[in-house]
């Protein structure tokens, strides 16, 4: 199965056009996928005391978090689609990792190391920004991929960033969508 984690509040956005491009391609190929639309789901990214108590025991009272965990545990491919705001992913995506990627699900504590709990062989990160990709490569390629994703078993990472997403030309955005359709 393919999981798509979408982290943008507007369905009128270029990020949503990216999501539609990916899902249109998957539908055309008859591939099974599940979209996790964090904003549409009204996902609460704030970890409160109750969440923390359950997190430490590897559980949750949230049916939605359990559903997200189930989707991820069945997925071999994961897409992340999000804008880069203030140099990193939106807070809702950070909260998704904080609350969903629990011990016993996303990872296990070994004697000497963390053992990944997920078995994702292809992880596609699609971002939008106004600045050049090189500015964000230390965050995405130097931290997010090796320390956040690989640690929990999201491997085979590919990153695609649409620079000048808001100020670039329509042709620029259409070319990016065509590129995404070719790799989806």
Placement of each model-derived feature along the sequence:
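Glycine-rich phosphate/pyrophosphate-binding loop and the adjoining helix
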Residues: 134-135, 139-184
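Short, glycine-/small-residue-rich phosphate/pyrophosphate-handling segment
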Residues: 108-151
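Short, structurally constrained coil/turn elements
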Residues: 27-29, 119, 153
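Glycine-rich, flexible loop/turn motifs
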Residues: 51, 114, 156
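N-terminal beta1-alpha1-beta2 submodule of the flavodoxin-like/Rossmannoid cofactor-binding fold
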Residues: 1-105, 109-110, 167-184
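Cofactor-binding loop segments of dinucleotide-utilizing enzymes, especially the Rossmann-like FAD-
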Residues: 7, 38, 127-128, 162
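Structured loop/turn residues at beta-strand edges in well-structured enzyme cores
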Residues: 73, 91, 118-121, 155
